[in-house]
Amino acid sequence: ARHLWSGGDDGQGSFDYQGRQFAVRGRLDVPPLPQGHPIIIQAGDSTQGREFAARSADAIFTRHGSLAEGQAFYADVKARLPKYGRAEHDLKILPGVGFVLGDTPEEAAERHAEVRRQQVSLQTAIVLLEQLWNRDLSGFDPDGPLPDFDPDVSATTVAKGRTRQHDDTLATARQWRELSRRENLGIRDLIIKVTGRQQFVGTPAQVAEDMNRYVQQNASDGFILVPHLIPSGIEEFVD
């Protein structure tokens, strides 16, 4: 693809590719892009995804729940770049983040709690738990405790049409159980806590300060805003 974006074999879009899996010959019928090639964004936090991003991407769309987690991810990915002959500025770390604004911190916190409960219904909580456990958990009470048995890691690596998001499923399950016991969380409340992307909650001034802190302290190079309502959420943020 990069070869085609660069003008092909003759600089005019011609190509003749012979590969292991397929062969193709022809001419690209669109002019070369002024910027050379489209921006390549890799999405995901897996080890394979990080390596692909370090090798080939311009930006990585990620998610993490705290400043410390963001800094660890940032350092890990940036450290992979030199072996591919790339500098730190060649790859931008852009976590997807939500935000909830209020005239006061208390109002923002109240709005945030309501938004999260709307996002994670009783049924959704069970479905998200099934994606980790790789089992049918439809008989479990969403407000009850987590399963006392381990996830099924012997079968497929895809649950409910989605690939697994965790490199170590059993370790993640243990962490969730520990968090559930420590904070006395039922399934739904736990899922609300562990599945939410990074949220900036507060007054506009507080949110701006927090976002700047993440950039200045090497947890991100910027952000991809993910409002809970579109388009009104973006409009609220801009205003």
List each language-model region with its residue ranges.
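Generic long, charged, amphipathic alpha-helical segments
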Residues: 177-210
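C-terminal helical cap(s) of enzyme catalytic domains, especially alpha/beta-barrels
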Residues: 1-2, 70-79, 231-239
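A conserved active-site cap/scaffold subdomain adjacent to cofactor or substrate pockets
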Residues: 54-66, 110-112, 125
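Internal, glycine-rich beta/alpha segment that forms the wall or movable "lid"
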Residues: 1-56, 81-90, 98, 126-158, ...
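Short, conserved secondary-structure transition motifs
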Residues: 91-107
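Short, acidic/polar
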Residues: 42-52, 203-217
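Structural preference for beta-strand elements that scaffold enzyme active sites
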Residues: 39-41, 59-61, 90-94, 221-224
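C-terminal structured "cap/appendage" subdomains that terminate the fold
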Residues: 211-239
